[in-house]
Amino acid sequence: MMAATTLTMTAQTQADDVLNVARKVNNFFMAKYSDPTLPTNVNKVRPSSLWTRAVYYEGLMALNDIDPQLRYVDYTDRWATFHHWTPRNGINTCDADDQCCVQTYLIRYRENHDEAILVRAAANLGHQMQTPNDQKNATAKTKGTQPSLYGWWTWIDAIQMAMPVYMQMYKLTGDEKYRDHAMKMYRWSRNECGGGLFNTKDGLWWRDADYVPPYKEPDGRDCY
């Protein structure tokens, strides 16, 4: 009994330590970027709805799940409202870098039930589901790949940034078209893009279509 109690107390102490570190890191971030509407400026000025900032809000919402604080929600809503709860570069973007922010919008939708959020997300995904990455629509990331209706995720980060948006929409609406299309896009990235971004032999993903064989690092190894 004493051993079990000690283990429980140790586990709780470790959990508290982790939470305290997360709070400190987030407090630093929110103090440094006190105005969430300001653009980012890392070698280039970009809107704060860019993926590099969007992934922070994913983490903030996860922190809010275990450490609920109104200031987390207020900070997030200021950011999202400034960007009109819309993907970076608008409804007609097919770039996962632009869509990443929608993950947080949909998390907030579960709480505020603002139907406009769902409408914008549905419009964006609806556009993508009808738009192939052909010459007319190609971006810098998709040029050089075989045109496909499912061929927008040519780098593996995109799977993390955009696939959850599809699955969130499936869960929120019950419409299987979001789940099914996302899985087709995932399989295209895994099995077809550049000959397939997943190396079944090593069990690792090549970073993007530019790094599949015959590309090698200077030491002759594959680049993951």
Where are the language model's segments positioned?
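Glycan-recognition and catalytic cores of secretory/periplasmic carbohydrate-active enzymes
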Residues: 12-224
